UniProtKB/Swiss-Prot annotation:
Substrate binds at S15, D18, R45. Catalyzes the conversion of N5-carboxyaminoimidazole ribonucleotide (N5-CAIR) to 4-carboxy-5-aminoimidazole ribonucleotide (CAIR). Keywords: Isomerase, Purine biosynthesis. The keyword Zinc does not apply. This is N5-carboxyaminoimidazole ribonucleotide mutase. Its EC number is 5.4.99.18. It catalyses: 5-carboxyamino-1-(5-phospho-D-ribosyl)imidazole + H(+) = 5-amino-1-(5-phospho-D-ribosyl)imidazole-4-carboxylate. One of its GO terms (biological process) is 'de novo' IMP biosynthetic process. Belongs to the AIR carboxylase family. Class I subfamily. It is an enzyme of class 5 (isomerase). The lineage of its organism: Archaea, Methanobacteriati, Methanobacteriota, Thermococci, Thermococcales. It comes from Pyrococcus abyssi (strain GE5 / Orsay). InterPro entries: PurE_ClassI, PurE_dom, PurE_prokaryotes. The keyword Isomerase applies.
Amino acid sequence: MVKVGMPKVGIIMGSDSDLPVMKEAAKVLEDFEVDYEMKVISAHRTPERLHEYARTAEERGIEVIIAGAGGAAHLPGVLAALTMIPVIGVPIKSKALNGLDSLLSIVQMPPGIPVATVGIDGAKNAALLALEILSIKYPEIKEKLKKYREDMKRKVEEKSKKLEELGWRKYLEG
């Protein structure tokens, strides 16, 4: 996204192989017209860069960080340790344990260093959670979130009505 103003959300991933998952967070933020920055920063391979990112995030206007990582998945926890900005961890599905290793690495933080954690490959929900955090300060985001939820409700009600009218067999056929 072209940065119009200062970014509000940082989307960080440990590897470019995480991009197919993490792009879903970017899509949501774009739909809500919220500025973001997206970077690949490895907690293990580029620790100095990660420290610099965390140290300067607030002065760059970052208010929430979404951090996706697979495997050992230390990125979200290290970021949370280095900054007071809320960090939302996205466990990325791995080959070895289908993302369970990532989930447990992110969710099991020591007391005093919390990381909000979404489901495996849950970048879309991470972005929605980031928007909810921002909506405390930005009423225009809160209004867009209300509309988003109303639209979801309407779609479910439409599907239910269609199912009731057609029956399950015809519903599944078309």
